Amino acid sequence: MTNKPVERQGSSRKLSYNSQFLFDGPAELPPKKQKVKKAKEKRLTFFTATSAIMLGVILGASIGSGAGVLAQNYLTRPPAIIVNNLESVNWVTAASSAAAPSVVTIRVAGQNSAGNGSGVVLTSDGYIVTNAHVVTLDGSTADVGLSVRTNWGEVFPAKLIGADPTNDLAVIKIESTKPLTPMVFADSTKINVGDQVVAIGAPLGFEATVTRGIVSALNRTIQVASSENPDEQGLQFWSGSSLPPVNLGVIQTDAAINPGNSGGALVNDKGELVGVNVAIAKTGSSAESGSIGVGFAIPANVVKRVSDDIIATGTATHGVLGVLITDSMSSDSGSAFPVGALVVEVTPGGAADKIGILAGDVVVRLNDKLITKSSELTSAVRQERKGTMVEIEILRDGSKLVFDVVL
């Protein structure tokens, strides 16, 4: 995890901010506010399907000297939906307004590092889902302080309920003074490439930021750094560290996702959750690179399955096939494409062994997901709950075979 040291003015203590969050402390206190004539505004705090509203610009919190003053300002200036022109609103306004009350900003702090991320409200009594890498500092969730700012501006301490590094998800909980607004989940198996989506979160600390785009691709598999690795950061792809990567099955979107969006919402045109933002691709080597229009989100159905497990038991279970696999290539040439997951070894007594899968078999499908490389099979299996029955299709000696297997 690449950390950027930032020294607070008036203090010898240095805080190392995870570059995932791209935060720098202000050099001095903000200037005294000048009195200005306040324009008349219409504010709405509740959205219905026929409401027409415009999202206002909300500034995120800064970290560093003067943080106490800024925090006080924020408690008196909560995020708000501002209506400026009822005749010029659109679906983005409607969708983001429906979902925004269910998106929170998360502050994480340890002894030597700190950062910000986003989260999605699961229940009215305070359960919130985010990325495991958001609640992890220096490769650990131990001794990490968590705070949550709600959509209406109140700040609450949070406790970690459980984390699932395998799917880069975690659940935290706050004790709020009033019921939270749970996010409405869409069925992520029903979305299409080309569907319009909105990303909501706190990129660079700018809370309640909304960006629009489309679903660029489905059933992608990416490799990201494990949240358990102190030398790697979240949001970015795996860079070849000593710990194995995490293989995630994700939705690809061109909605702008930046550091601080991690754990935030990707919603459809109805304001329903289709995914939790988790990673971005970048062109440069800098850890502070921003969006290039290639972002990724964990599908809502996976988020619900994992978060339900964590709330119920404090942990999440995963399917296990019981095979050692590698990519099956289309040819022996250097220009070959991967065409499936080649079984190198079968674990005796494991799920694959019980149904007769053999070394040399090539897995090409799991349920409705086509498998073209080993990482896709790994992510597909691990997204399933332990004990789930799935259908697997393999190639053996030129013939296709289909098996039902309990993971």
Predicted regions mapped to residue ranges:
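A conserved glycine-rich beta-strand in the N-terminal activation segment of trypsin-fold
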Residues: 49-50, 86-92, 107-129, 154-159, ...
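Catalytic histidine site
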Residues: 56-68, 109-141, 188, 369
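Interdomain regulatory linker/hinge segments that flank or connect interaction modules
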Residues: 65-83, 224-227, 277-328
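Active-site loop architecture of trypsin-fold serine endopeptidases
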Residues: 110-115, 134-143, 180, 200-214, ...
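PDZ/PDZ-like groove recognition
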Residues: 115, 251-252, 256, 305, ...
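Active-site substrate-binding loop(s) of clan PA
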Residues: 159-161, 178-207, 214, 298, ...
